[in-house]
């Protein structure tokens, strides 16, 4: 009996986002659809366990058998709350399980508030593409992107971004379009282009916040 014909063609890579902290985040952005989800996770410090991390990496790479590239993508919540050692271990596991001829493409989406020289050096060493959540100049960014105490996060984000730029890390901007910045698109774009030197920008509209303006 002949084997089942290969009607799907050669193996293809796919993109899967992992959220190692679940919905847990150090910011309290009022438009975030994930804010109410944090209470659904067990305990007060939900974290992906190392045995689960290894199983995830192994299965992700096994599912890419024959594909030349494996996308390893991290999101949150805020994934950097896991700490740098978690991501060092994830890279070790990827290197362990990659098949001959395969390469890994690393991406992470972060609010940048916890980044420093050590994070930047790690991202550079392993060719991470880092997505930074930033909503424009200070007044527009801080309208919704605040910490748990209600204080704007702009200075922390710009500080984190400066570490990435100094290290030559490849990054892009993810900008949420909301009531505060929706009619100031040119200003936001020029800020990201000229002040942040962003080469790739995503604009994502949101709902769920007061359409008359920030509170």
Predicted feature descriptions by range:
Residues 77-78:
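Active-site neighborhood of divalent metal-dependent phosphoester/pyrophosphate hydrolases
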Residues 3-6, 52-56, 62:
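Short, motif-level signal for alpha-helix interfacial/capping segments enriched in acidic residues
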Residues 11-51:
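Canonical Radical SAM [4Fe-4S] cluster-binding loop centered on the CxxxCxxC motif
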Residues 1-13:
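Long, charge-rich, low-complexity alpha-helical segments
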Residues 3, 17, 157-158:
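Short structured motifs
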Residues 57-73, 82-206:
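Radical SAM/AdoMet-radical enzyme domain recognition
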Residues 41-43, 142-146, 212-214:
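Short acidic, glycine/proline-rich loop/turn micro-motifs
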Residues 36-41, 139, 208-211:
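A short, flexible beta-alpha/helix-coil linker loop
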């Amino acid at each position: 009996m002949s084997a089942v014909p290969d009607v799907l063609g050669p193996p293809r890579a796919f993109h899967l986002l992992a959220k190692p902290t679940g919905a847990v985040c150090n910011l309290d952005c009022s438009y975030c659809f994930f804010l109410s989800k944090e209470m659904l996770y067990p305990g007060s410090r939900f974290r992906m366990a190392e045995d689960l991390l290894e199983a995830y990496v192994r299965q992700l790479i096994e599912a890419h058998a024959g594909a030349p590239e494996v996308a390893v993508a991290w999101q949150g919540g805020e994934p950097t709350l896991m700490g740098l050692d978690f991501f060092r271990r994830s890279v070790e596991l990827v290197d362990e399980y990659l098949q001959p001829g395969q390469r890994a493409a690393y991406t992470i989406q972060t609010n940048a508030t916890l980044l420093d020289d050590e994070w930047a050096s790690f991202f550079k060493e392993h060719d991470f593409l880092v997505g930074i959540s930033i909503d424009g100049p200070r007044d527009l960014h801080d309208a919704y992107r605040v910490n748990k105490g209600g204080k704007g996060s702009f200075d922390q984000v710009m500080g984190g971004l400066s570490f990435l730029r100094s290290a030559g890390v490849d990054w892009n901007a993810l900008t949420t379009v909301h009531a505060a910045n929706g009619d100031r698109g040119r200003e936001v774009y020029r800020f990201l282009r000229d002040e942040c030197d962003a080469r790739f920008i995503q604009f994502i509209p949101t709902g769920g916040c007061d359409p008359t303006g920030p509170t």
